[in-house]
Amino acid sequence: MKALMFGWEFPPHILGGLGTASYGLTRGTAQQEDMPIPFVIPKPWGDEDQSFLKIIGANSVPVVYKDNDYEYVRQRMEGKMSPEEYYHLRNNIHYDYSRIGTDELGCVGFSGRYPDNLLEEIGNYEAVASVLAHALDFDIIHSHDWL
């Protein structure tokens, strides 16, 4: 079984209880055989333990189609995802999210916190979730109730 999981924070970056709950849930799920765990958070910091899951930064998922060459994508996405992953996600944008401000790659910036514009960030997170839901292969989606 494949589960696509969404959270808002992940250790060691704890802002409330959600990160701790996400860690326990993913750690327990990872003990199941043949259960890959892609776990989406708005902004990874790079020091999260990914030994039992794959963290996907919502800030690296394109939501607006931008025509960029391979080398540019490789340089900008280094350490986040491969150019092939980027193009696969970009080619699975099914809705017009051009109302959302994006960077040159069509990705949305996230604070990685609980900012004053939290509702806007949640709306942008929905756009990322839509792209991932169309692009990735999974059997079930897990998301906390307020996401």
Which stretches of residues belong to each language-model region?
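Short His-centered aromatic/hydrophobic patch
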Residues: 122, 143-147
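A conserved catalytic-core segment of Leloir-type glycosyltransferases
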Residues: 34-133
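A short, glycine/small-residue-rich beta-strand->loop->alpha-helix junction that serves as a flexible
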Residues: 9-21, 47-50, 118-120
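Glycine-rich phosphate-binding loop signature in dinucleotide/nucleotide-binding domains
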Residues: 134-138
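Short amphipathic alpha-helix
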Residues: 19-30
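Short beta-strand segments
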Residues: 7, 39-41, 142
